[in-house]
Amino acid sequence: MAKKDEHLRKPEWLKIKLNTNENYTGLKKLMRENNLHTVCEEAKCPNIHECWAVRRTATFMILGSVCTRACRFCAVKTGLPTELDLQEPERVADSVALMNLKHAVITAVARDDQKDGGAGVFAETVRAIRRKSPFTTIEVLPSDMGGNYDNLKTLMDTRPDILNHNIETVRRLTPRVRARATYDRSLEFLRRAKEMQPDIPTKSSIMIGLGETKEEIIEVMDDLLANNVDIMAIGQYLQPSKKHLKVQKYYHPDEFAELKEIAMQKGFSHCEAGPLVRSSYHADEQVNEASKKRQAQA
């Protein structure tokens, strides 16, 4: 664990091999031309080159690029957001179709300034992608929408392939890590989503390295399973800037492998766990695995 004013040295296993090809450069050019945002870029995701260049998957960030919250782990800009762009859903869908994406993840900044939390634009984005790229699987990754479950229903009625909502950290650290969200509200959000559409897989992820214990990580697993979450992702927290929370521990890949084994033994249909794993990492594979498990249980 890091001492109060100590910065840990980043270990060798966190060095990233950069892959760039026409998929990567084409998608990046398309984003700029269409005034679109991706969480891959805004949140400084370490897997952007693999996802864009190799796997042909991308995570679009809608509802603008400014978040109304200021979570202490997140690199996305915060402040007063711009007005909603009602043409954004069509531009996202056009980009998905043009790039022939296998899997599209749609996330958003938190829009606590909007009565519907942005659910209307979220839902229209899903519908637009369905029209223009019917073979692309769609994962939605909303905020907790302030715990308004009518807004969640608006989104779930579009029947995405996966509903993803991140609990982010263990119960004890939640007030410090994301002060404007609550651990139990995230669990309730996931439970309600499954109740609304029981056949749609649900997913959640946590970052580790913020000072949690192994027992607390396992408690998160149990809490997610108790609320019928199918898929879990576990990744290393990386400090985006000096103003964000410091890394307290860098977990070894072997520790991630052990956590994945525990999660699978407990009953998740899929668990991604590794130093560079993020919420949408290998998301295209998770759709297929969750579908196979549901078919086997039918």
Curated annotation (Swiss-Prot):
Transmembrane segments: none annotated. Its main location: cytoplasm. SUPFAM superfamilies: Radical SAM enzymes. [4Fe-4S] cluster 1 binds at C40, C45, C51, S280. Its EC number is 2.8.1.8. One of its GO terms (cellular component) is cytoplasm. [4Fe-4S] cluster 2 binds at C67, C71, C74. Its cofactor is [4Fe-4S] cluster. Residues 53-269 form the Radical SAM core domain. Binds 2 [4Fe-4S] clusters per subunit. One cluster is coordinated with 3 cysteines and an exchangeable S-adenosyl-L-methionine. It is an enzyme of class 2 (transferase). Pfam families: LIAS_N, Radical_SAM. InterPro entries: Aldolase_TIM, Elp3/MiaA/NifB-like_rSAM, LIAS_N, Lipoyl_synth, rSAM. The keyword Transferase applies. It catalyses: [[Fe-S] cluster scaffold protein carrying a second [4Fe-4S](2+) cluster] + N(6)-octanoyl-L-lysyl-[protein] + 2 oxidized [2Fe-2S]-[ferredoxin] + 2 S-adenosyl-L-methionine + 4 H(+) = [[Fe-S] cluster scaffold protein] + N(6)-[(R)-dihydrolipoyl]-L-lysyl-[protein] + 4 Fe(3+) + 2 hydrogen sulfide + 2 5'-deoxyadenosine + 2 L-methionine + 2 reduced [2Fe-2S]-[ferredoxin]. Belongs to the radical SAM superfamily. Lipoyl synthase family. HAMAP family: Lipoyl_synth. NCBIfam families: lipA (TIGR00510), PRK05481.1 (NF004019), PRK12928.1 (NF009544). This is Lipoyl synthase.
